[in-house]
Curated annotation (Swiss-Prot):
Protein name stated in the entry: 5-methyltetrahydropteroyltriglutamate--homocysteine methyltransferase
Record field: catalytic activity: 5-methyltetrahydropteroyltri-L-glutamate + L-homocysteine = tetrahydropteroyltri-L-glutamate + L-methionine
Lineage top rank: taxon: Bacteria
Keywords per UniProt: Amino-acid biosynthesis, Metal-binding, Methionine biosynthesis, Methyltransferase, Repeat, Transferase, Zinc
Gene name for this UniProt entry: metE
Molecular function terms, GO-annotated: 5-methyltetrahydropteroyltriglutamate-homocysteine S-methyltransferase activity; zinc ion binding
Catalytic class of the enzyme: transferase
């Protein structure tokens, strides 16, 4: 038996973020349509070549997306929201795709965006309408398959599976069972598979990550119906990732498919036992190389594990655990990483090399080459940069009292209301203000040593002063300093905490054109000196209004970084929590008495199986409270969350015991607030009243409409008024117009409430 290798997908953004730049140029009218298409074609060709040159046998196609692969599937199925379809003669084209993703006017809003399972990638949520007619409308998968075949590659097309697609979407309008749409979309899937079968391909990868979830019974049974219907078109490799599918094996093993892919990184399998449950004729694809982290793989360990089942399986593939979408592209692009640490890492291109080395070692039963690859892993175990005894000692000395505020919210709230004397429906923002070219240049010049500390501080303070001035002119109640010193909400803190390392080009896609460069946690974490105190203190000196300090929470820093794999996530989170606790207390000493600790990643850290939620939420909440609980009653703690559903973790959110929580709700039309109807959240809430991810300027009427919706769920005396998220990606004109309308809406609502009372 020859063992072949494959990846489940490759990063689509380009080595130098070419896709991001092309998207933004196209949206602004600075790039022609034909030239934009050429950028996409060039990126695909480069990706295929990189994988082939690294030794990948089956080259994936269909993993490229102009914005998001779930949105591409909606386009393929012709599942276009009516408000976007009627803009341009019902034409389903690239501009239609971008309208769905970004919106084009207040009346033609973007579709909702949310997290892709428990990752930091975001997808555009499909909208389902009972009466929508669906048909094969977007032939990107066929065109790109032909493109790769013409170049001589052994091609493996990738399609998001029908059940997972329906699971990820939401009903708009009249309620009906989403599974009723299965009979409408399966003929389209069948048509696509039949057309692919006419090409020179061995099999098609159909992604069904929903199989790792605790699905309702009828959804499990739907798999049988769907894949019986698709049987006979072409060979199907059913692909799962992010967790184990053992709990659903009885529904999977009878499916008429070519084989199954499992994630051996995040799924806890007894491989020998699991293999025995599968049909002998199936090909088994083992996801052994972590697609979501940057550490070099222990190929010797993997060789031994895979070798145990070789004689029991006639056909075997090895691959990445999931798409390499979540990994930076090429470690060789990093010129400033020190020699010691650089040997510890593996990015997408190197992960392809790992798959090639491992498949060759297994086929030859020879471990010489992989032993050499693993030598740096063993060296890391003895590095002084990893283990720090003083951090470990402090963590071991934590007491229960460190996780609790001294008094309840009701007592704190009375003291805070007396101290701050804010109006009903107080206005604030989430933290960041527009990151202008001047701000970016200032930071870049400082980082490159072109300006000194004094000039940098003068420049940053100038921008802070402008932000404070604009907020005062607008009449905002609680101000922020605007974060001009921060390139990214996680990277900035990582740069100022010990235990992190940074890349120059380790970009990964978060959504659309938004890319992030996560820091890497390489050792025990601690704070060496104050991080934000200087800037917040200066901002507060410019105004009599309260200024809110902005910190990124421990769970978000953890999950938006590439974490260590040698200790538990809980330990890392609590180390970060202790470091932030020091920062919070220093802010309080300097009379900064409203402090926001952002935790947008709280929900994405949830295990995909609900049976494991309580354990995770227990330590995640503890890490937050460790950072926030040391302050006085009069210091108001805020937290912010975005892009997520809250209804099933409301108890955990309440246990955070933040005085105020601000949340993303505008894009979902306040739908998330339904959670507050059944769960009486005890503290204050700022439901986002407009979507900052769209360039649309919200009207006063639309903001008041959303506030009235919020009042139906939350007592008005506990509501704050704020945008959905930070304003970093918006320009100043959009920001001023939107905030002006937000403040006007809040004032009009106050006047209305006064008249009623």
């Amino acid at each position: 038996m020859t063992i072949f290798n494959h990846t489940l997908g490759f990063p689509r953004i380009g080595l130098n973020r070419e896709l991001k730049k092309a998207q933004e140029d196209y949206w602004s009218g600075n790039l022609l349509y034909e030239d934009f298409l050429c950028v996409g074609s060039q990126l695909r060709r480069e990706n295929w070549k990189k994988q082939k040159d690294a030794g990948i046998d089956y080259i994936p196609v269909g993993d490229f997306a102009w914005y998001d692969h779930v949105l591409s599937t909606s386009m393929m199925l012709g599942n276009i929201p009516e408000r976007h379809l009627n803009v341009n003669d019902n034409k389903i084209d690239l501009d239609c795709l971008f309208r769905i993703a970004r919106g084009c006017s207040p009346d033609v809003a973007a579709s909702e965006m949310t997290k892709w399972f428990n990752t930091n990638y975001h997808y555009i949520v499909p909208e389902f309408n009972k009466n929508r007619i669906l048909k094969f409308s977007w032939k990107q998968i066929l065109e790109e398959t032909d493109e790769a075949l013409l170049l001589g590659y052994k091609v493996k097309p990738i399609i998001l599976g029908p059940i997972t697609y329906l699971w990820l979407g939401k009903i708009k309008g009249e309620y009906f069972d989403r599974l009723d749409l299965l009979k409408n979309i399966l003929p389209i899937y069948k048509q696509v598979l039949r057309e692919l079968s006419q090409r020179n391909i061995d099999f098609v990868q159909i992604d069904e990550p929903a199989l790792v979830l605790d699905l309702p019974e009828k959804w499990k049974k739907a798999y049988s119906y769907a894949y019986e219907y698709l049987n006979g078109t072409t060979k199907i490799l059913l692909t799962t990732y992010f967790d184990s599918i053992e709990h659903n094996i009885e529904y999977i093993r009878d499916l008429p498919i070519y084989g199954i892919h499992i994630d051996l990184v995040f799924g806890k399998y007894n491989l020998f036992d699991f293999n025995s449950k599968l049909p002998k004729e199936w090909i088994l694809s083992l996801g052994v190389i972590n697609g979501r982290n940057v550490w070099r793989a222990d190929l010797i360990k993997l060789f031994k594990s895979i070798s145990t089942i070789l004689k029991f399986r006639k056909k075997l593939l090895i691959g990445s655990s999931c798409s390499l979408l979540h990994s930076p592209i090429d470690l060789q692009k990093e010129k400033n990483l020190d020699k010691e640490s650089k040997k510890w890492f593996s990015f997408a291109v190197q992960k392809c090399t790992e798959l090639s080395l491992l498949s060759k070692a297994l086929n030859k039963n020879d471990t010489d080459s992989i032993q050499k690859w693993c030598s740096s892993i063993y060296e890391r175990n003895f590095s002084k940069r990893v283990q720090k005894i003083e951090v470990q000692n402090r963590l071991s000395e934590i007491l229960n009292v460190n996780f609790k505020r001294s008094d309840s919210y009701n007592i704190r709230s009375r003291e805070q209301k007396k101290k701050f004397n804010l109006p009903i429906l107080p206005t604030t923002t989430i933290g960041s203000f527009p990151q202008t070219l001047q701000i970016r240049k200032l930071r870049r010049d400082y980082k490159q040593g072109l300006i000194n500390d004094v000039d940098y501080e003068i420049g940053i303070k100038k921008h802070i002063k402008e932000v404070i001035k604009e907020q005062e002119k607008l009449g905002i109640d609680v101000l922020v300093h605007g974060e001009p010193e921060r390139n990214d909400m996680v990277e900035y803190f990582g740069e100022n905490l010990d235990g992190f390392i940074f890349t120059d080009n380790g970009w990964v896609q978060s959504y659309g054109s938004r890319c992030v460069k996560p820091p890497i946690i390489i050792g025990d974490v601690s704070r060496l000196k104050p991080i934000t105190v200087k800037w917040s203190k200066y901002a507060q000196s410019l105004t009599d209004k309260p200024v809110k300090a902005m910190l990124t929470g421990p769970v978000t820093i953890l999950f938006w970084s590439f974490p260590r794999e040698d200790i538990s996530l809980e330990k890392i989170a609590k180390q970060i929590g202790l470091a932030l606790r020091d920062e919070v207390l220093d802010l309080e000493k300097e009379k900064i008495e409203i402090i926001q600790i952002d935790e947008p990643a709280l929900r994405e850290g949830l295990p995909l199986r609900k049976s494991l939620w309580n354990e995770y939420l227990s330590w995640a909440v503890d890490a937050f409270r460790l950072s926030s609980s040391g302050v006085k009653n009069t210091t108001q703690i805020h937290t912010h969350m975005c892009y997520c559903e809250f209804h099933d973790i409301m108890h955990a959110i309440s246990f955070l015991d933040a005085d105020v929580i601000t949340i993303e709700t505008a894009r979902s039309d306040m739908e998330l607030l339904k959670s507050f109807k059944t769960f009486k959240y005890p503290n204050e809430i700022g439901p986002g009243v407009y979507d900052i991810h769209s360039s649309n300027i919200p009207s006063i009427t639309s903001i008041k409409f959303l506030l009235n919706k919020a009042i139906a769920y939350i007592p008005v005396e506990r509501i704050w008024v704020n945008p959905d998220c930070g304003l970093k990606t918006r320009n100043w004109n959009e920001t001023i117009l939107a905030l002006k309308n937000m403040v006007c809406a809040a004032k009009e609502m106050r006047d209305k409430i006064k008249k009623i009372t």
